[in-house]
Amino acid sequence: MSQRAKQIKKQTLAGSPYDTGYEHGKLAEVQIKNSLQTYEKMFREYAETSWDEACDQALLHVNYVKEHYPSFLEEMKAIAIGAKVEFEDILVLNCRSEIALTSPDGCSSFALTQPKTEKTWLAQNWDWKREQVNSILHLELVQDNLPTIQMITEAGIIGKIGYNSHGIGVCLNALRTNQWQAKLPIHLGLRAILESHTFEEAISRIDQNQIASAAHFLIASKSKDIISVEVSPVYTEKILPKHGSLQHTNHICSSKMKKTMDEFAKPDSFDRLCILSDLIDSQIDKSINHEFLFQLLANHDNYPNSICRHHNPALSEQEQTETVFSIAMNLNDAGFYWFLGKPCQYF
């Protein structure tokens, strides 16, 4: 590691959904308002959607969430109170993937387990709007009768990338399609996974077309299980590991799923997946550690649209995405490693 990685202090939130939500909103008021500014601009310029229209669309999900996960609504309402904003504002943040269905999210993720490696690992670069580097939080949620969650998230969003005290972890890849229904938003699906006690329970939360729009969830467990799940409101496909590894970027891999929807994948997603697959096949051995995984995530092949993603002057402002944070998780030993910015800054 060439220099000290930039991180953010972990914030531990404990208690009821209201308690954790209120503290989240209170401690992250500035970061939440930065998120609101980022997405107001993005919806207006990229999706031609006003904030009022975004609120109306987000509200379409309330009935489904209320029926299946009422505690999520309680937590979001409390975040709004703590941050001195409206409930609809926080709801929009948690539905932001559904409001801009073809927004240019990027991400490269992979999972490793036996026989490829001794330990079970999850790792990814999260590529998004550079403004959101100022909204990133490291949260630990301690809840009654539920696993303790540790995750890296955008301020105001209650589900993101992380793991829990039962050894269940999840990474996320956006998929650009035309599919949407008023079901469980992607980020709330991530939270549902993180509240699971077992690998099987985690899969059951998202594998029956419960999710409102298309995405890829990469799930791993300290039981040494890993699985890719490409989800949507109309079709869901589970992809099993080959020789102890799985990798994904931002296009649909299931041939059956491709037939059920229109997809708007970018060419660099296919390039990144090929590069990532080759790196894993050629360089991974059983005794790897998190620093080695970050070296893979620092790869610059096909720069600037590389695994470690940089500003691309050939793209419009609306299309720009960069690596905002990198994360590696050891599910067996509860190792949680991450930092802000691009991994090439440190490896």
Where are these regions (language model features)?
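Internal mixed beta-strand/loop scaffold within catalytic domains of large alpha/beta enzymes
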Residues: 95-187, 324, 336-339, 345-346
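Cysteine-dependent hydrolase recognition
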Residues: 168, 192-193
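Solvent-exposed, amphipathic alpha-helical segments
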Residues: 189-192, 279
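C-terminus-biased signal that marks the final domain/tail of proteins
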Residues: 1-105, 115, 196-236, 244-347
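Short, charged, low-complexity patches
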Residues: 179-187, 195, 199, 269
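Short, charged/polar low-complexity linear motifs in solvent-exposed/disordered segments
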Residues: 138-141, 188-190, 219, 245-246
